[in-house]
């Protein structure tokens, strides 16, 4: 009983000191039973058995007729025991949760390790994939190269096929060159006794040769000319391939189309040509005779060129504009002299107009443009030769149309002067055109000369 009052039980539950103050023997028995129950059942029974035991003890105490204070104490004990049981349950739940958490962490750690182990072989797989890709690319490149090589080989074979034909053509040309060289040797042997005759032909030609008489190249050049002439006779050349050259520089032409004299002092090695070039020479026999025929044609055609088209044009112009009365303009062949003469004639005609209209009013002739704008100058010039045609004093400078009409109509009727100027044009222009006025005055002068009203030095 002493242990239950102030000390704690083995399972950690404390007994309140009120249990020791209980005066009733029933209550003391209940306390003892409770203590014994706590000691005996703490190790074996769980919280549920403990609660049932307490309920039984309470019921017994109730049946024994204990006091209400004891009932309250029992209720408190029940609640304490239930709270402890709940705390134990919670502690066990916490322990179970901790265990579950530990198991989860271990499982997670195992999974992490598994993942690490799984991730470790990934670089190897990537490497294998890359190697496979590289191998496939290399195979493709090799296939392309082999295809290109095969194509190139096929092209080379195709190109190499016509080569035998070319070789055959080259052999044919070599054979032709050999035969031509043999023919040339025969021609040279035949040409040696004929050299004097050829020299006689060349000396008889009219062409001039600028070669020194004692130079050693002269004989070689003469021999080459002879050979070229004889080769032209032996080897025919088509006129389409070798047209005649229009140049007249020497008696014969070399294979290059130049005369041997034009080369000057050339060495024998430089002047000699290959056998393939010699047969194609466009030389023809006796070219000096053709040149003789051509030379007179040029001499005859030179003086037959037409001369003096300008003189004919001048005559036509002077006949049209009445320049015959003006004098020696057609005699000038130099353009500068002709221009000076025309300027002199123009000035002379201007001075003549001034002299004819000197005493007339409203007339001051200084040129062939503005001085004739009012029409009074035309009227004064015509009134000078035909004073009975109209009264000059009645004319008004402001009436331009009347003045032009009177002057042109009177000149046409009395002097047979063509009306080269239009009245409307003269009225429309404030300053008349000098060329038009000069042409009309020139025509009027010619008409007056034909009428005998103006005397010239020639007549």
UniProtKB/Swiss-Prot annotation:
CDD domains linked to this entry: CH_SMTNL1
Function as written in the Swiss-Prot or TrEMBL entry: Plays a role in the regulation of contractile properties of both striated and smooth muscles. When unphosphorylated, may inhibit myosin dephosphorylation. Phosphorylation at Ser-301 reduces this inhibitory activity.
Disruption phenotype: Male mutant mice perform better than wild type in exercise stress test after endurance training. Females do not differ significantly during these tests. Even in the absence of endurance exercise, mutant mice exhibit muscle fiber adaptation, i.e. more type 2a fibers and lower levels of type 1b fibers. Endothelium-dependent vasorelaxation of the aorta is enhanced and responses to beta-adrenergic constriction are reduced. Expression of PPP1R12A is 30-40-fold higher in mutant mice than in wild-type littermates and exhibits a steady decline as the animals become sexually mature (at protein level).
The protein's name: Smoothelin-like protein 1
Positions of transmembrane segments: none
Localization annotation: Cytoplasm, Myofibril, Sarcomere, I band; Cytoplasm, Myofibril, Sarcomere, M line; Nucleus
Name of the encoding gene: Smtnl1
Expression induction: Significantly reduced by exercise in smooth and in skeletal muscles.
Annotated keywords: Calmodulin-binding, Coiled coil, Cytoplasm, Muscle protein, Nucleus, Phosphoprotein
SUPFAM superfamilies in UniProt: Calponin-homology domain, CH-domain
Region Disordered, residue ranges: 1-314
Compositional bias segments (type: Low complexity): 260-283
């Amino acid at each position: 009983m002493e242990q239950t009052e102030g000390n704690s039980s083995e399972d950690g539950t404390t007994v309140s000191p009120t249990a020791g103050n209980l005066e009733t023997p029933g209550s003391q028995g209940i306390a003892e039973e409770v203590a014994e129950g706590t000691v005996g059942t703490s190790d074996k029974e769980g919280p549920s058995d403990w609660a049932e035991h307490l309920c039984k003890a309470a019921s017994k105490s109730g049946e024994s007729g204990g006091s209400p204070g004891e009932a309250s104490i029992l209720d408190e004990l029940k609640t304490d025991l239930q709270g402890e049981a709940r705390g134990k349950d919670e502690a066990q739940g916490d322990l179970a949760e901790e265990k579950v958490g530990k198991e989860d962490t271990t499982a997670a750690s195992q999974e992490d390790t598994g993942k690490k182990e799984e991730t470790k072989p990934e670089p190897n797989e990537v490497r294998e994939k890359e190697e496979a890709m590289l191998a496939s690319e290399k195979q493709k490149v090799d296939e392309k190269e082999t295809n290109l090589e095969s194509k190139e080989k096929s092209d080379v074979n195709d190109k190499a096929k016509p080569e035998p034909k070319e070789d055959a053509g080259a052999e044919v040309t070599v054979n032709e060159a050999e035969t031509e060289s043999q023919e040339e040797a025969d021609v040279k042997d035949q040409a040696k006794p004929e050299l004097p005759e050829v020299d006689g032909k060349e000396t008889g030609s009219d062409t001039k040769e600028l070669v020194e008489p004692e130079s050693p190249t002269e004989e070689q050049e003469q021999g080459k000319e002879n050979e070229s002439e004889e080769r032209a006779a032996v080897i025919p050349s088509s006129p389409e391939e070798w047209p005649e050259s229009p140049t007249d520089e020497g008696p014969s032409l070399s294979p290059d189309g130049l005369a041997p004299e034009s080369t000057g002092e050339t060495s024998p090695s430089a002047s000699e040509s290959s056998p393939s070039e010699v047969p194609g020479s466009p030389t023809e026999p006796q070219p000096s005779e053709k040149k003789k025929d051509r030379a007179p044609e040029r001499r005859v055609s030179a003086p037959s060129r037409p001369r003096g088209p300008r003189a004919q044009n001048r005559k036509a112009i002077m006949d049209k504009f009445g320049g015959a009365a003006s004098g020696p303009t057609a005699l000038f062949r130099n353009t500068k002299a002709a221009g000076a003469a025309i300027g002199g004639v123009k000035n002379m005609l201007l001075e003549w107009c001034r002299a004819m209209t000197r005493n007339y009013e409203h007339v001051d002739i200084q040129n062939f443009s503005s001085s004739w704008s009012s029409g009074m100058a035309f009227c004064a010039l015509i009134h000078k030769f035909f004073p009975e045609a109209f009264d000059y004093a009645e004319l008004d400078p402001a009436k331009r149309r009347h003045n032009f009409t009177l002057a042109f109509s009177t000149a046409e009727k009395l002097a047979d002067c063509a009306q080269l100027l239009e009245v409307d044009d003269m009225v429309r222009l404030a300053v008349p055109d000098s060329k038009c006025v000069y042409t009309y005055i020139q025509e009027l002068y010619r008409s007056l000369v034909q009428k005998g009203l103006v005397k010239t030095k020639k007549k």
